[in-house]
């Protein structure tokens, strides 16, 4: 059963909805040009009121290790998620779990089926169907997991468009990730209607959703509950 992260939390109410529905982790976006950006002091207040055993993930793009370290300390984050072209080795000294986002070309969108707008206007992670060799050469403590997101129209991250889970090239990519031994966190266009199929086809360590549990650009309590309920269903053999 995968761990579930609700990303783009901006209010205490949204955090409470996610926790009550059974989320394992909450994501706070510290990318200034994201529409889901949250001020560190606001995130800190939300985090101070969370129950124990909920992971607190800070999402960054092209931020210096010093800047990330300050927010980690201020907000008591236990995980950072890097969405730019950062070298994970530069953040090795930070005593947190480190996740690196990797962008994979998305499946064609069937019409205008998503309410999502891109989260990150500054992300420069180049979409590719193969992992860079540098991922194979990282020293210990530099990386603890790979988050796989979708890219479309020159945008990477937060596109709201699903990944091509069924295709041979995508399945081959999953094998590459598996060979590295890093846990896979699946993102990219997940929603309550497709999450169970996505889990069955990819068997990820975790899943990450933001726009898929929103209505009119804000988190929706019923969508969060439905998403987590679907993700918790036991997959058939």
From Swiss-Prot:
GO MF annotation list? phosphoribosylanthranilate isomerase activity
Is Isomerase given among the entry's keywords?
A: yes
Q: Name one GO biological process term.
A: L-tryptophan biosynthetic process
One Pfam family name is PRAI
- Name the reaction it catalyses: N-(5-phospho-beta-D-ribosyl)anthranilate = 1-(2-carboxyphenylamino)-1-deoxy-D-ribulose 5-phosphate
Residue ranges crossing the lipid bilayer per the database entry: none
Origin superkingdom: Bacteria
Q: Which InterPro entries match?
A: Aldolase_TIM, PRAI_dom, RibuloseP-bd_barrel, TrpF_fam
Has keyword Cell cycle? Answer: no
Instruction: Kindly tell me the pathway this chain contributes to.
Output: Amino-acid biosynthesis; L-tryptophan biosynthesis; L-tryptophan from chorismate: step 3/5
Q: Which UniProt keywords apply?
A: Amino-acid biosynthesis, Aromatic amino acid biosynthesis, Isomerase, Tryptophan biosynthesis
Q: Which family does it belong to?
A: Belongs to the TrpF family.
- Which HAMAP family does this chain map to? PRAI
Q: What is this protein called?
A: N-(5'-phosphoribosyl)anthranilate isomerase
Q: Which organism is it from?
A: Desulfitobacterium hafniense (strain Y51)
